[in-house]
């Protein structure tokens, strides 16, 4: 019976990277693990199939060989003289000829080292005030931690993992493939070089247990959306005493009702009435440090920016503090009573109408442009 494609076993495309392959393996291994399917021979066979596919596709050299030659790259006789040796003499060094493809598949391989723990990611949402000032937050994350009973060995206290009698601790076995020898993962110990005869009752021989741990994370002042904080060694525990992975805290800053942030500068809109815009005055504006007075000069136009130095965000990497830029928005009055309408009518007449040249230079420029446009059309 033909063996199933390794990519199909893990449910990943042939273009999948190592991260995608590991994610698929972890999901399937949890589903079909013998400890969760005791007595289920079909699940046990599926688990072995998944593990075999994972070991091949996460080894760069073996994956390259599989992509080029399929299962024949690893099966007894699959790469014999007919497959590779037809054009070479008996004295050829096949490990040199095919080294670029197979790497350390040829020659004396080494056992699989215990894997470093996986890195973890935590998405943390902050308010703008928390991001600007810095904050310490407690988080809870599900992870794999070293078993406290066996200290990660997987063996019951008082016992030790035994050297694999098949590979004698090498983690690999040598098989003859036509004119040369090929190293394969030891099928007895799955490449670890050791066997656990008496597994730990707490972790069932895995050396790690699932836990949810609480961490206190210090967020420095000045962080922004997209910043990432690394907590070394706070990821998943490694296998058999290998180093733990890292935890990466990904920052996301919530939208603020008043301020917008661009780099280390803050922006806000300040509405003023048209009388203040024309005559000038002072208005109270918010900052992250409290309220301050902004002086508005006379004849201020809508969209005018006023810079308040040092009222922005201090860079997380040090250096000068950003500024607060207040954008003035001149509001048109609404809900006018008869007296206010009469006063405005009188004011407009004093301007010489809607396009008064002296008091509304932009209006004059605009209407002059409109007149020229229509004059040009009629010529």
Swiss-Prot record:
Keywords noted in UniProt: Chaperone, Cytoplasm, DNA replication, Metal-binding, Repeat, Stress response, Zinc, Zinc-finger
Segments forming CR-type zinc fingers: 134-212
Binding site for Zn(2+) 1: 147, 150, 200, 203
Positions of CXXCXGXG motif repeats: 147-154, 164-171, 186-193, 200-207
UniProt record, GO biological process: chaperone cofactor-dependent protein refolding; DNA replication; protein refolding; response to heat
Binding locations of Zn(2+) 2: 164, 167, 186, 189
Residues annotated as domain J: 5-70
Record text on cofactor binding: Binds 2 Zn(2+) ions per monomer.
Quaternary data: Homodimer.
Role description: Participates actively in the response to hyperosmotic and heat shock by preventing the aggregation of stress-denatured proteins and by disaggregating proteins, also in an autonomous, DnaK-independent fashion. Unfolded proteins bind initially to DnaJ; upon interaction with the DnaJ-bound protein, DnaK hydrolyzes its bound ATP, resulting in the formation of a stable complex. GrpE releases ADP from DnaK; ATP binding to DnaK triggers the release of the substrate protein, thus completing the reaction cycle.
Family: Belongs to the DnaJ family.
Domain topic, free-text comment: The J domain is necessary and sufficient to stimulate DnaK ATPase activity. Zinc center 1 plays an important role in the autonomous, DnaK-independent chaperone activity of DnaJ. Zinc center 2 is essential for interaction with DnaK and for DnaJ activity.
Designated name of the protein: Chaperone protein DnaJ
């Amino acid at each position: 019976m033909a063996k199933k494609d390794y990519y199909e076993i893990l449910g990943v495309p042939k273009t999948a990277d190592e991260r995608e392959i590991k994610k698929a393996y972890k999901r399937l291994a949890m589903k079909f693990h013998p400890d969760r399917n005791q007595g289920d021979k079909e699940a046990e066979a599926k688990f072995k199939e998944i593990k075999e596919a994972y070991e091949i596709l996460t080894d760069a050299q073996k994956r390259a060989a599989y992509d080029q030659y399929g299962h024949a790259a690893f099966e007894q006789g699959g790469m014999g003289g007919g497959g590779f040796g037809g054009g070479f003499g008996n004295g050829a060094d096949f490990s040199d000829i095919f080294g670029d493809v197979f790497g350390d598949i040829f020659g004396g391989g080494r056992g699989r080292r215990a894997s470093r723990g996986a890195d973890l990611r935590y998405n943390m949402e902050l308010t703008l005030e928390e991001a600007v000032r810095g904050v310490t937050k407690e988080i809870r994350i599900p992870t794999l931690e070293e078993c406290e009973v066996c200290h990660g060995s997987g063996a019951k206290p008082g016992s030790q993992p035994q050297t694999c009698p098949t590979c004698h601790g090498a983690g690999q076995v040598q098989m003859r493939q036509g004119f040369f020898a090929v190293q394969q993962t030891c099928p007895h110990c799955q490449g670890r070089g050791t066997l656990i005869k008496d597994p730990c009752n707490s972790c069932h021989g895995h050396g790690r247990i699932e836990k949810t741990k609480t961490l206190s994370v210090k967020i420095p002042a000045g962080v922004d959306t997209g910043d990432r904080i690394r907590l070394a060694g706070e990821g998943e525990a490694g296998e058999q005493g290998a180093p733990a992975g890292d935890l990466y805290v990904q920052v996301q800053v919530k939208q603020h009702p008043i301020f917008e942030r661009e780099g280390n500068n803050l922006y806000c809109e300040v509405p003023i009435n048209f009388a203040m815009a024309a005559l000038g005055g002072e208005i109270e504006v918010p900052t992250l440090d409290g309220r301050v007075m902004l002086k508005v000069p006379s004849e201020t136009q809508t969209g005018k920016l006023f810079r308040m130095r040092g009222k922005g965000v201090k860079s997380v990497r040090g250096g000068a503090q950003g500024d607060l830029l207040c954008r003035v928005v001149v509001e048109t009055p609404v809900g006018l009573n008869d007296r206010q309408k009469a006063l405005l009518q009188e004011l407009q007449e004093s301007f010489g109408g809607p396009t008064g040249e002296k008091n509304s230079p932009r209006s004059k420029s605009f209407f002059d442009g409109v007149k020229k446009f229509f004059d040009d059309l009629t010529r």
